[in-house]
């Protein structure tokens, strides 16, 4: 029993090292607050550890982690709409991290992303993380056949809001804005 717990714990730690930063960047896009994103990551990997302990399937760990993170973020956002969170006064004095943005495109992209509906943010963030349409469908709780159409609409709305051309820059900016120092 003790040996299997160590093996399970090490497997969870290995997956955290492999996917933790990407899950965090994804969570920041969805919950829009770094502390909440950290909570989503912690909740996701705790569930993953329990999943491993229960002998759960590990054939698509990355997809599983992003699906659980999406659900945790959605649950957190629902709770947030019911309760106004208390933030200590010193939180308001800490400025958000500043990323290099010489021509304002990054700020424009970030602002446009924040204004999008939750499902659009979710779809864009999942795609930016490289998940398959099947995994995106599972995480977003939509039919796999609908992913392409809904994702295209989300990209169109985001690009219309930012004025960014459809030449791949959109996804690059989405990934760059997600976490300071990422890429």
Language-model regions, residue ranges each:
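A short, charge-rich alpha-helical start-of-domain segment used by transcription regulators
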Residues: 1-25, 35-38, 49
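Arg/Lys-rich amphipathic alpha helix in sigma70-family domain 2
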Residues: 53-56, 67-88, 102
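Internal acidic/polar
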Residues: 83-106, 132, 173-179
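Hydrophobic positions on the alpha-helical face of helix-turn-helix-like DNA-binding modules
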Residues: 44, 68, 123-124, 136-137, ...
């Amino acid at each position: 029993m003790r040996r299997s717990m160590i093996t399970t714990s090490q497997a969870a730690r290995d997956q955290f090292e492999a996917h933790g930063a990407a899950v965090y960047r994804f969570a920041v896009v969805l919950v829009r607050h770094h502390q909440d994103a950290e909570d989503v990551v912690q909740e996701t990997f705790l569930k993953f550890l329990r999943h491993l302990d229960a002998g759960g399937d590990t054939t698509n760990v990355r997809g599983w982690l992003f699906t659980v993170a999406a659900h945790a973020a959605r649950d957190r956002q629902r709770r947030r709409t019911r309760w106004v969170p208390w933030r200590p006064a010193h939180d308001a004095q800490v400025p958000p991290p500043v990323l290099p943005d010489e021509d304002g495109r990054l700020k424009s992209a970030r602002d446009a992303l924040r204004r999008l509906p939750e499902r659009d943010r979710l779809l864009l963030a999942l795609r930016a993380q490289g998940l398959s349409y099947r995994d995106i469908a599972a995480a977003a709780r939509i039919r796999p056949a609908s992913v392409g159409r809904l994702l295209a609409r989300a990209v169109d709305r985001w690009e219309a809001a930012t004025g960014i051309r459809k030449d791949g820059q959109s996804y690059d900016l989405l990934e760059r804005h997600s976490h300071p120092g990422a890429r």
